[in-house]
Amino acid sequence: MNQAIHVNSKNLSGPGHWSDMDMMEVGNPGMTVTEQASHFAIWAMFKSTLMISTSIPAANSDTVAILQNRDLIAISQDEAGLPVSLVQRFTNDRDVYAGDLANGDKAVLLLDLSNITR
């Protein structure tokens, strides 16, 4: 996931043209609930297709809650179709991304990419 967010997709997506950051891993083994929520937020903010790759009938309540986040789904489906872009790197593992939405609002994504629980 860390490599996927460093790809500059700003000029690769827009209305009718969407990024493809590959499969979403939400609900699959290998990530904590917090990591899964971050993963979903990254896919939504970068306007990648939100293609679910886990078994819906087997999904637990945390997975369902993440996949039903209406605010992130709305950002993903915003008609401007513009992904967020890096606006500030505070250290090697903390980034701030922002992007414009069709209604004039800004979508902001704060990421801590370290492997340390804070």
Language-model segments: what does each one mean?
Residues 1-55:
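Glycan-recognition surfaces
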Residues 43-46, 51-53, 89-118:
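Carbohydrate-binding surface patches
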